[in-house]
């Protein structure tokens, strides 16, 4: 099967023709934290650009910060007095936390920092700078000249949606008051470069030159204008922008009839959420998961893998609970398939999985770097007697990583150790968490179980070195020969070590503990 990004890249080349440079675009209004749902738009544009580059094409990925949009409402996590800044450009609203030049910069800088960890580069542009520099001045004037044509297009779609037409006073632009910087009322246009305004906030009246940057195109005109200005070939969009009669439909007509360019190809991307979290994430509401939250428990390549393997038009729910362990298992399997150490069900699946891995890695490794099983690390990081070196030693003894480790191997293992610790602290359900009991609990055990425990203890005393499989067989045989049901037997063993009825896989767990400690505990001596 062809990966969806490759399919899109081929379609772009086929429909846009052979070009010297292809332009892909993404865009976000920094009105709140840029969350993992917003990231889907950015990554979809990036990965399609990646697929184009893999075909030898030159690609420019523009990420447009729509920081000249109005500050529409005060989020819950912002002081209420920030309402005095409503309708100003978000780039000109002060940072409530006092650490950045503006409200918008606070969110933009964090996202750009997060992106760099994923090995992704893009051309970050700021709408505020483009408008203020006069870059869009000719297009603004053109939109004013063709105001009636634009209004007719918008009204046509409004009629189809059974909505009333736009008011006769409607204009394709909005104005920021040069004095107080809040949204002013449009009065008139002189037919050339000046528009008259009246500010309902500070009372100022006058003229402003389009080239001075106080005049901004409204969204449904701004978007198609950008497509033409930057010669955009591809831009993904959320389903709200791609519904019938929405901004993509109107933009498609406006860009052709007003700005003389063909609308870019697009892909609809679906909602991204966290499994178990109700409702849609909102950067202004504050109920968001950021890329930096994912970095606490996932390798960068696995974050990219989540988005690369899922078709954009499918809803994506990231499981930070037990499902995260399955995600690590899945990624490690795909990585082994890529390096030829395992095989998929069939050649088609293998080809797609290998391609997904290529698109997932910030930098493709030349070999398989040591994979410390995340599930097992979740157990090991909860053992107080093990530091990082001790954990690595256990991994080597039990055959999970090679005896001879390179710096890259050690770096990756230590990263996973830190991620496993974070996961246990932040997301692990209670039945996964445990702590070793300092002394045996006072519980009643029937004689057969005591005998089985002593048998395992004697075997351990006779064997300084052993494999996990050997220990596993001894544990099962000791119970089987005495007719002890497995459930009862394991419950007893977990209780004497961690005081719970269930726990991590028993044989690897016991093999990770000090042998003398295990022997004494099985004898209920300490």
Swiss-Prot record:
- Write down the InterPro entries for this protein, in alphabetical order: aa-tRNA-synth_I_cd-bd, aa-tRNA-synth_I_codon-bd_sub2, aa-tRNA-synth_I_CS, aa_tRNA-synth_I_cd-bd_sf, Lys-tRNA-ligase, Lys-tRNA-ligase_SC_fold, Rossmann-like_a/b/a_fold
Q: Where is this chain primarily localised?
A: cytoplasm
One Pfam match, given by its short name, reads tRNA-synt_1f
Q: Where in the cell is it found?
A: Cytoplasm
**Catalysed reaction(s)?**
tRNA(Lys) + L-lysine + ATP = L-lysyl-tRNA(Lys) + AMP + diphosphate
Protein's name in the database? Lysine--tRNA ligase
Can you quote a single GO CC term? cytoplasm
- List the lineage, top down: Archaea, Methanobacteriati, Methanobacteriota, Thermococci, Thermococcales
| SUPFAM superfamilies assigned to the protein according to its UniProt record, in alphabetical order | An anticodon-binding domain of class I aminoacyl-tRNA synthetases, Nucleotidylyl transferase
GO MF, one term, reads: lysine-tRNA ligase activity
Return the motif ranges for 'KMSKS' region: 280-284
Q: How is the cofactor bound?
A: Binds 2 Zn(2+) ions per subunit.
Q: What is its EC number?
A: 6.1.1.6
Regarding protein family, the annotation reads: Belongs to the class-I aminoacyl-tRNA synthetase family.
Q: Which residues bind Zn(2+) 1?
A: 95, 99-100, 106
Where do the annotations place Zn(2+) 2 binding?
177, 199
PROSITE patterns named among the record's database cross-references: AA_TRNA_LIGASE_I
| Cofactors | Zn(2+)
State the CDD domains in the record.
LysRS_core_class_I
Biological process terms from the Gene Ontology for this record are: lysyl-tRNA aminoacylation
Which keywords describe this protein according to UniProt? Answer: Aminoacyl-tRNA synthetase, ATP-binding, Cytoplasm, Ligase, Metal-binding, Nucleotide-binding, Protein biosynthesis, Zinc
Short sequence motif 'HIGH' region: positions? 30-38
**Organism encoding this protein:** Thermococcus kodakarensis (strain ATCC BAA-918 / JCM 12380 / KOD1)
Gene transcribed to yield this protein: lysS
């Amino acid at each position: 099967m062809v990966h969806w990004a490759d399919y899109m890249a081929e379609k772009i080349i086929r429909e846009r023709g052979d070009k010297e440079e292809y332009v892909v675009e993404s865009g976000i209004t920094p009105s709140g934290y840029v969350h993992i749902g917003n990231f889907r738009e950015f990554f979809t544009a990036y990965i399609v650009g990646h697929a184009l580059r893999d075909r030898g094409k030159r690609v420019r990925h523009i990420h447009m910060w729509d920081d000249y949009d109005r500050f529409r409402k005060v989020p819950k996590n912002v002081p209420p007095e920030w309402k005095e800044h409503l309708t100003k450009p978000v780039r000109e609203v002060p940072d409530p936390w006092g650490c950045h030049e503006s409200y918008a910069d606070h969110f933009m800088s964090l996202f750009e920092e997060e992106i760099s960890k994923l090995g992704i580069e893009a051309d970050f542009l700021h709408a505020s700078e483009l408008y203020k520099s006069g870059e869009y001045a000719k297009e603004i004037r053109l939109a004013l000249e063709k105001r009636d044509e634009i209004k007719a297009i918008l009204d046509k779609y409004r009629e189809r949606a059974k909505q009333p037409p736009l008011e006769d006073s409607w204009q394709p632009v909005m104005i920021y008051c040069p004095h107080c910087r809040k949204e002013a009322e449009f009065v008139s246009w002189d037919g050339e470069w000046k528009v008259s305004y009246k500010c309902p906030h500070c009372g100022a009246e006058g003229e402003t030159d389009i080239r001075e940057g106080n005049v901004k195109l409204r969204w449904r005109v701004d978007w198609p204008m950008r497509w033409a200005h930057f010669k955009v070939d591809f831009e993904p969009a959320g389903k709200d922008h791609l519904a019938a009669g929405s901004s993509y439909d109107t933009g498609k007509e406006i860009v052709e009839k007003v700005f003389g360019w063909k609308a870019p190809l697009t892909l609809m991307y679906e909602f991204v959420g966290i499994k178990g979290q109700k409702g849609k994430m909102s950067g202004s509401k504050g109920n968001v998961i950021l890329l930096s939250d994912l970095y606490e428990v996932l390798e960068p390549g696995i974050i990219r893998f989540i988005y690369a393997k899922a078709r954009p038009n499918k809803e994506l729910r990231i499981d930070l609970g037990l499902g995260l362990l399955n995600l690590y298992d899945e990624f490690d399997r795909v990585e082994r398939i890529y390096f030829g150490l395992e095989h998929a069900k069939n050649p088609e699946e293998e080809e797609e999985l290998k391609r997904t891995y290529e698109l997932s890695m910030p930098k493709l490794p030349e070999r398989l770097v040591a994979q410390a099983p995340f599930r097992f690390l979740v157990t090991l990081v909860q053992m107080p007697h093990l530091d990082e070196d001790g954990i690595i030693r256990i991994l080597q003894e039990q055959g999970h990583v090679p005896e001879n480790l390179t710096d890259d191997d050690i770096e990756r293992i230590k990263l996973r150790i830190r991620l496993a610790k974070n996961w246990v602290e932040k997301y692990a359900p209670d039945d996964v968490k445990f702590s070793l009991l300092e002394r045996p609990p006072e519980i009643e055990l029937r004689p057969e179980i005591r005998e089985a425990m002593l048998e395992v203890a004697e075997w351990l005393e006779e064997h300084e070195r052993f494999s996990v499989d050997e220990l596993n067989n001894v544990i099962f045989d000791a119970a089987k020969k005495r007719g002890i049901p497995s459930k009862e037997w394991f419950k007893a063993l977990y209780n004497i070590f961690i005081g719970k009825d269930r726990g991590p896989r028993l044989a690897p767990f016991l093999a990770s503990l000090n042998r003398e400690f295990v022997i004494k505990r099985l004898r209920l001596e300490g």
